[in-house]
Amino acid sequence: MNIRTILPKDKFDVESVEKLAKRSNDELREILPELMEWLQDGNWPISKPVENLLLRFGVELIPYIQYVFQTRDPQWEYFMLSGLIPRLPLECLRMLKPDLERIIECPTDSEILEELDDVIVPMLNQL
C-alpha cells in the first residue's frame, strides 16, 4: 500500500493519523514533509496527534524544522516553537540554536509581530 494514500485528507482526519501511527518509521520517513505541514496551525484537531507521531523521529526532524524557519511563516514558526520543539530532546534544541538566534537577532517584521522572541528566549536559556 502506498503510504501517501493514508495521509490526512483534512484537519479533522484523526483516523488517518491513527493509521499512520501504526506504520514503521521507515514507511513514514517519505512523508515527513507532508506531516510537518499539519503543524502549521496548532488549533487544528490533527495538529497534536501529528506532533505526537513526529516525536518518534527526534533529530531526524531538524532539516524539516529548519525548512519551516526558512519559509518565514511566523504562525508556522510559532506552532513549531510552542508545540513540537519543546517536546524534542535537548540535543535538537542545540542543533536549532543558530536558527533560533537568527530569529532573535534578525527577525522579519512578521516574526516581530508574532512575538516569537517571547517563546525563543526561554528555550535559549535552557542551553
Question: Whereabouts are the PLM-identified features?
Answer:
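Amphipathic alpha-helical scaffolding segments comprising HEAT/armadillo-like alpha-solenoid repeats
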Residues: 1-4, 26-38, 59-69, 90-104
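Structural detector for internal amphipathic alpha-helices that build alpha-solenoid repeat scaffolds
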Residues: 4-5, 10-25, 37, 45-57, ...
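Surface-exposed polar/charged interaction patches
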Residues: 23, 71, 103-106, 126
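Short inter-helical turns and helix N-cap capping residues of alpha-solenoid HEAT/ARM repeat scaffolds
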Residues: 42-43, 72-73, 108-113
